[in-house]
Amino acid sequence: MRHVIRRIGIYLLAIWAAVTINFFLPRLAPGNPAEIVYDRLAQHGAVNPATLKALELEFGVNTTDPLWVQYISYLNNLIHGNLGVSTTFYPHNVTDIIGQDIKFTLVLLSVSVILSFTLGTLLGIVVAWKRGTALDTVLSSVMTFFYSILYPWLALMAVYFAFTIGWFPFSDGYDLSLTPGWNLDFLMSAAYHAFLPALTLIISTVAGWMLTMRNSMVTTLSEDYVLMAQAKGLRQRRIMFAYAARNAILPSVTGFAIALGTVVGGALLVEIVFSYPGIGYALFQAIQGQDYFLADGILLLIIVATVLMNLVVDVLYSVLDPRVRQERSA
Amino acid sequence: MKPTPLPPISASAPDKTNGVSAPPPRQSSATSKVFASIRHALRRLWSVMTANRKVMAGSVIVSIFILVAVFGPIIIRQNPFAYTKDLVQPPSSAHWLGTNQGGQDVFVQLIVGTRSSVMWALITGLMVMVISVAVGLVGGYLGGVVDDALSVITNVFLVVPAFPLAVVAVEYFNRSSITIAIVVALTNWPWGARVLRAQTLSMRSREFVTASRAVGEKTWRIIFLEILPNEIAIVAASFITTTIQVLLAVAALEFLGFGDNRAISWGTMLYDAQTGSALFQVAWWWFAPPGLCIALLGAGLALLNFGIDEVADPRLRQLKRRVRRGKAVAA
């Protein structure tokens, strides 16, 4: 129980740190969002100094309030789910934009992470079981190469092949002539468009899972209880999965929590390369347009989501490893 | 699980030999001893580099890239930004890897970019290691409130996704290689710190530490001169892993256009290719080579790392005989 409380404390701190960084970053930066929107409006004419004042008031910048008052009002806004107004998609709320884009990211990410984890772990089990064979040598070498592939480059190559061969679409999240909704046409189109982004995400992450699982499985295979299971004459598959893999998977689960951050980063890049309408692409557009509120809102969401996923992994871990529940391991 | 420390790679012997050598023929004797110890150190390095197939393959790949980074730009002596009239030409004898949209030679850019990419990956990796060593060792050795505080900070940073944070942070500062290096270093240190802290915890109660404490050695000396040398294998392993990570992170940030556009590196080459729509001109020679180089260098580093793991942890070695014997016993 103490372990769980400690972890939750760390997660709350992480969220608080993220919020605080989010508060300070834009204030350290030169320029302010009000001026950017003002400049944009000025290009279309019809502005006066009062407009700038109004914008500054709306964005809560360039005020004479001391920093801590700004901080409190920022926290207050956050608690009420008010992340501010997007300057690129003015006057849309940041919350609305995120709500619209998050669905694409969620589906793409969850499908590819689950597939890649399952596939990588299974490959790791098989390769460790057959270690020293040609299969192991070939797969391990190929995966070592994949392990250090630059994600956006892989995505570029995929786009290149999609472009030259013309098999899969390589931009947008769905056929733009369709209206998003729960109908078969739209879902098929969305799946078709998600295929390449998901495939590249899987290829770039599967190696990490496989190599982690292989190493941990090889260590487990030399344990006495595996020898004992063999001595008892149990079926090979049972030893492989119920004895060795069952115990070897723990480091992978820990790795899962740590890799989440990386995977989220990968998703960010995948969406940018494929112009996929998720929050990663929105973040990129926000940064290019110096849209601080949108960028910070998305960053905050990404951090909170990663923290929550870590919590889920922790609970899963304590289910898988009884020692954690008995507080013998840190 | 305590990996046995590798034999020290660095040549530490010369300092000792100077004091020991006899006075009269000092010059020649001292130099010959220095040569002997250098030769010894090189032989040591050679034996580590050729410890097994993985380490050897890894060292060859990494050495080639380092040699190209050091000497490449000196040998080819061409301006990577020089414009020519051969726009988007496929590879030929004049331009080994073709040209890009500005008619710039891709091969020249690749070689010149190697220096920047390799150098910044190593510098950033070093920065990460300095932070993780400081945080991990100080926290692990001192314990108590300091350790609690450092552990909490480490865990918080471990949870926060590094890349999105780096993207947003980089945006707020001026675009240069050093900005990227600092941001990447600040978002990538916690993993190494955690590993080193765990190792230091187990080191702390060893006898040599107790002995130096009893002698009254200063705390910083115990941490950095007694404990650190004993953890050098782990530091080296996590330096390699970290360098792969930062190589990828730096290149990814440069790919997004946060790089220094007056310098050339693999990441900025990819950025140019993306913005110059190399893809839709089917100019594979423009964007394929930098990515391949990154993957190759990364794979070389990874091989080096896995190889060192196998040297340190014999259970990971692919000893077929041992497995068979195990099965024979079982049957």
Task: List each model region and its residues.
Chain B
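N-terminal signal-anchor/first transmembrane alpha helix
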Residues: A30-F81, L150-I153, E231-I232, G298, ...
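Short membrane-interfacial helix/loop motifs at transmembrane-helix boundaries
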Residues: S32, V70-V108
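Generic hydrophobic transmembrane alpha-helix motif, especially the helices
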Residues: W96, N100, M127-I131, G140-R206, ...
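Transmembrane alpha-helix signature in integral membrane proteins
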Residues: V106-Y141, L296-L297
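Transmembrane alpha-helices
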Residues: R115-I131, W220-A252, L301
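Glycine-rich helix-loop "coupling/hinge" segments at transmembrane-helix boundaries
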Residues: L158, A169-Y172, Q199-T200, T241, ...
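C-terminal transmembrane helix and the adjacent membrane-cytosol boundary/short C-terminal tail
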Residues: V184-T187, A233-T241, W284-A331
